[in-house]
């Protein structure tokens, strides 16, 4: 069993999603958004750090998964996003959580099957995969999708390791 915290970083809205993985079964534990309504960036970063720390304390995740920075057309926006990611990662590292990063295209490909999927498609698939009664908020759905991606990637890595071990022992032909 593992609890995974997914984070969709943003300087104004940071989505989070928490799921439990038992074997191949995924279950929803919680999700939402950390909203920073103050104007100055240092105060927003402080709120993101405090919010992520509180979520970690509440859910006690085993793994922390976050979306990688994409190349934005606006350099200022990309820098602010990078800083928001940074404080979220520091919150995880301060709690000694292993951090995993996933590209947005990889997350969409894993959850929807199309790397260029729309937000509404991600929301629908997250709802379906986690058997939720309604679509989660867009940023929370993205965070849940990041957590789901971590489960799939780590499960595939474990299966590959087991196959290599069996091959080394001469069990696969």
Curated annotation (Swiss-Prot):
**Self-association or partners: how does it assemble?**
Homodimer which binds Holliday junction (HJ) DNA. The HJ becomes 2-fold symmetrical on binding to RuvC with unstacked arms; it has a different conformation from HJ DNA in complex with RuvA. In the full resolvosome a probable DNA-RuvA(4)-RuvB(12)-RuvC(2) complex forms which resolves the HJ. A mix of monomer and homodimer in solution. Homodimer which binds DNA; there is probably a monomer-dimer equilibrium during DNA-binding. Can form complexes with RuvA and Holliday junction (HJ) DNA, in which the resolvase activity is inhibited.
Provide the alphabetized UniProt keywords: Cytoplasm, DNA damage, DNA recombination, DNA repair, DNA-binding, Endonuclease, Hydrolase, Magnesium, Metal-binding, Nuclease
Something else the entry says is: The dual incision reaction has defined structure and sequence requirements which must be satisfied for efficient nuclease activity. These requirements are biologically important since they serve as a control mechanism that prohibits the nuclease from cutting DNA at structures that could bear a physical resemblance to a Holliday structure.
Which organism is this entry from?
Answer: Escherichia coli (strain K12)
State what changing residue 8 to N does. Answer: Does not complement deletion, loss of HJ cleavage, forms dimer, binds DNA, dominant negative to wt. Decreases endonuclease activity, forms RuvA-RuvC-DNA complex
What the protein does? The RuvA-RuvB-RuvC complex processes Holliday junctions during genetic recombination and DNA repair. Endonuclease that resolves Holliday junction (HJ) intermediates. Cleaves cruciform DNA by making single-stranded nicks across the junction at symmetrical positions within the homologous arms, leaving a 5'-phosphate and a 3'-hydroxyl group; requires a central core of homology in the junction. The consensus cleavage sequence is 5'-(A/T)TT(C>G/A)-3'. Cleavage occurs on the 3'-side of the TT dinucleotide at the point of strand exchange, although there is some flexibility in the position cleaved.
Q: What is known of its domains?
A: Each subunit has a cleft approximately 20-25 Angstroms wide and 20 Angstroms deep, which is sufficient to accommodate dsDNA. Residues thought to be catalytically important (Asp-8, Glu-67, Asp-139 and Asp-142) line this cleft.
Which is one Gene Ontology cellular component term of this protein? cytoplasm
Reactions that this protein is recorded to catalyse: Endonucleolytic cleavage at a junction such as a reciprocal single-stranded crossover between two homologous DNA duplexes (Holliday junction)
Effect of substituting residue 105 to H:
Loss of DNA repair activity
Effect recorded for residue 115 to N: Inhibits endonuclease activity, forms RuvA-RuvC-DNA complex
> Impact of altering residue 139 to H?
Loss of HJ cleavage in Mg(2+), poor cleavage with Mn(2+)
Q: Which family does it belong to?
A: Belongs to the RuvC family.
The record places the active site at: 8, 67, 139
Cofactor binding, note field:
Binds 2 Mg(2+) ion per subunit. Mn(2+) reduces cleavage sequence specificity. Cations are not required for DNA-binding.
Q: What induces it?
A: Not induced by mitomycin C, so not part of the SOS regulon; it is encoded in an operon with at least nudB and yebC but also has its own promoter.
Q: Where in the cell is it found?
A: Cytoplasm
This protein's superkingdom? Bacteria
Write the protein's name.
Crossover junction endodeoxyribonuclease RuvC
